[in-house]
């Protein structure tokens, strides 16, 4: 079996919003990468034994006091190093170069001229000048710049406003770029990263979907042995892929618990049972807990309170069911790599909590189960590819995100069965028409929201005084920022008419045209 972790790239995070993007780009090249804090220490780096190191960008200024620096071992380990933006600046400062703050931050598109036929950039270009020099279309985002090269370095790139936009010490294999090769705005960014990872670091393409699945199955079997595993199955992408993976790895040793909260999408419970219990032969215990959830949410209007109640009750019910499974020794969870990174990052205490996380909180300590997280090394796009490899339906694997509390946070204010039933039907019509008009995969997330207010309407000769729903559709790459989807007016008109005509109790449909920021994607 191929050792998919034998060759790896270490990414030291200096706080850039693009750090995860660097890791994903490296993995897309078939090479395993991990993100760790810039101050992880020399011992850790030596033990990690990377084939190469990438220093990320970051929001700080190298010219300030007490700002982040790379551990000394980065430059003594003898492996190739690539500094990006802040990573370039700290490399320059630490190795004897000079960095200064610029009067005007450079942010956005720029054109870079390549110099000196460096191993990193040679032959990579978007255009050429009349004199034959290569030009690159790139993305810049910096407030400092290198104004003096460190000893041993040569100039490899420049722009009109940044005379030193790239530098290299070819002998020590240290390279640095002021621009961001990881973002799509830098058109040749993938080729630059490929040159660094595959040629300069000499990594082979071992990180492939087939190899990842084979590795995960082997590791699960070695760790679990003949013991039983319990998994909370929600119907979401992550838990569904874990279920499929464990079914392939350990078969009948897996039992899934599917808690039907009464806050799921239309027919979702039946779809989950059909896919896993009937089609894949997974042992699934379905718990109809609608009454318990609705009772617990009675009179509760605050979104955070609703989240906590739903999370606590889910854990309670899951705990009850898991206790009934004889000889269960392991709890499987759909933790993915961004969860691991965010959890590590939150320990710094610098992040502000906008909303408590959708995923269910920790299980009670009384539950004496060991944890198995087969997806904890994987990004979401990798999880989806594995789902397809394991035979899950495309529609399930590429389904839009759905919050852990379900419709509980898409019904504004108090949750009632009547509201949930109306919302389920409106949401189903919206999604059905998105599929029918080939728009579902063109938006990143789409759903309906129930507004607990009544609006007057007219049906035939009579007046109606019924509820309002809002439709929400957004386009985004990372869900950190999003723009509202400009769906065709004729399409919105059709969806609105269907909802109002087919669902007694709804008299008005609105469309949410708020971006993120300032709004969040979910309403609560």
Curated annotation (Swiss-Prot):
Q: Which GO terms describe its molecular function?
A: ATP binding; GMP synthase activity
Q: Which residues form the GMPS ATP-PPase domain?
A: 207-399
Q: Which InterPro entries match?
A: Class_I_gatase-like (IPR029062), GATASE (IPR017926), GMP_synth_C (IPR001674), GMP_synth_GATase (IPR004739), GMP_synthase (IPR022955), GMPS_ATP_PPase_dom (IPR025777), NAD/GMP_synthase (IPR022310), Rossmann-like_a/b/a_fold (IPR014729)
Record bears the keyword Chaperone? no
CDD domains linked to this entry? GATase1_GMP_Synthase, GMP_synthase_C
Domain of life where this protein originates: Bacteria
What residues sit in the active site?
85, 180, 182
Class of this enzyme:
ligase
> In what residue span(s) does the Glutamine amidotransferase type-1 domain sit?
8-206
Q: What is its EC number?
A: 6.3.5.2
Which PROSITE patterns does this UniProt record tie to the protein? GATASE_TYPE_1, GMPS_ATP_PPASE
The record's keywords, sorted A to Z, are: ATP-binding, Glutamine amidotransferase, GMP biosynthesis, Ligase, Nucleotide-binding, Purine biosynthesis
- Cite the HAMAP family for this sequence: GMP_synthase
Query: Which NCBIfam families does this one have?
Result: guaA_Cterm, guaA_Nterm, PRK00074.1
Oligomer and partners: Homodimer.
Q: What is this protein called?
A: GMP synthase [glutamine-hydrolyzing]
Q: Which organism is it from?
A: Methylococcus capsulatus (strain ATCC 33009 / NCIMB 11132 / Bath)
Its gene is guaA
């Amino acid at each position: 079996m191929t050792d998919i972790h034998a060759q790896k790239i270490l990414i030291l995070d200096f706080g850039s919003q693009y750090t995860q993007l660097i890791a994903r780009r490296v993995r897309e090249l078939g090479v395993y990468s991990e993100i760790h804090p810039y101050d992880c220490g020399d011992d850790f780096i030596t033990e990690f034994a990377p084939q190469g190191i990438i220093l990320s960008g970051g929001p700080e200024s190298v010219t300030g006091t007490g700002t982040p620096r790379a551990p000394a071992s980065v430059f003594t380990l003898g492996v190739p190093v690539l500094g990006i933006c802040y990573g370039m600046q700290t490399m320059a400062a630490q190795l004897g170069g000079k960095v200064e703050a610029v009067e005007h931050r450079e942010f956005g598109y720029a054109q870079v001229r390549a110099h000196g036929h460096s191993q990193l950039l040679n032959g990579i270009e978007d255009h050429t000048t009349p004199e034959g020099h290569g030009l690159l279309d790139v993305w810049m985002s910096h407030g400092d710049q290198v104004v003096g090269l460190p000893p041993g370095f040569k100039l490899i790139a420049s722009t009109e406003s940044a005379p030193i936009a790239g530098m290299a010490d070819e002998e020590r294999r240290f390279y640095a770029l002021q621009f961001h090769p990881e973002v799509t705005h830098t058109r040749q960014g993938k080729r630059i990263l490929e040159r660094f990872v595959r040629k300069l670091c000499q990594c082979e393409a071992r990180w492939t979907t087939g190899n990842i699945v084979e590795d995960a199955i082997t590791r699960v079997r070695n760790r679990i042995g003949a013991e039983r595993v319990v998994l909370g199955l929600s119907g979401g992408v992550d838990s569904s892929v874990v279920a499929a993976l464990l079914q392939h790895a350990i078969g009948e040793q897996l039992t899934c618990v599917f808690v039907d909260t009464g806050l799921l999408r239309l027919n979702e419970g039946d779809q989950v049972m059909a896919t896993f219990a009937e089609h894949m032969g997974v042992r699934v215990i379905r718990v109809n807990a609608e009454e318990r959830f609705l009772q617990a949410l009675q009179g509760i209007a605050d979104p955070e309170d609703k989240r906590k109640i739903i999370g606590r009750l889910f854990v309670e019910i899951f705990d009850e069911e898991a206790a009934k499974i004889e000889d269960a020794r392991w709890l499987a969870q759909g933790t993915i790599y961004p969860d691991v990174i965010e959890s590590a990052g939150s320990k710094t205490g610098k992040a502000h909590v906008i909303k408590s996380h959708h995923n269910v909180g920790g299980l009670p300590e009384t539950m004496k189960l060991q944890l198995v997280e087969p997806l904890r090394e994987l990004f979401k796009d990798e999880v989806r590819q594995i789902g397809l490899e394991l035979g899950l339906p495309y529609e399930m694997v590429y389904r839009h995100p759905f919050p852990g509390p379900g419709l509980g946070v898409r019904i504004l204010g108090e949750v009632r069965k009547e509201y949930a039933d109306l919302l389920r039907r409106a949401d189903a019509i919206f999604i059905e028409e998105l599929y029918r008009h080939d728009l579902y995969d063109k938006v990143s997330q789409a759903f309906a929201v129930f507004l607990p207010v009544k609006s007057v309407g007219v049906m035939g000769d009579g007046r109606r005084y019924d509820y309002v729903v809002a439709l929400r559709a957004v386009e985004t790459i990372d869900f950190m920022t999003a723009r509202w989807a400009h769906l065709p007016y004729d399409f919105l008109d059709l969806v609105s008419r269907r909802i109002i005509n087919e669902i007694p109790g709804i008299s008005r449909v609105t469309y949410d045209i708020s971006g993120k920021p300032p709004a969040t994607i979910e309403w609560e």
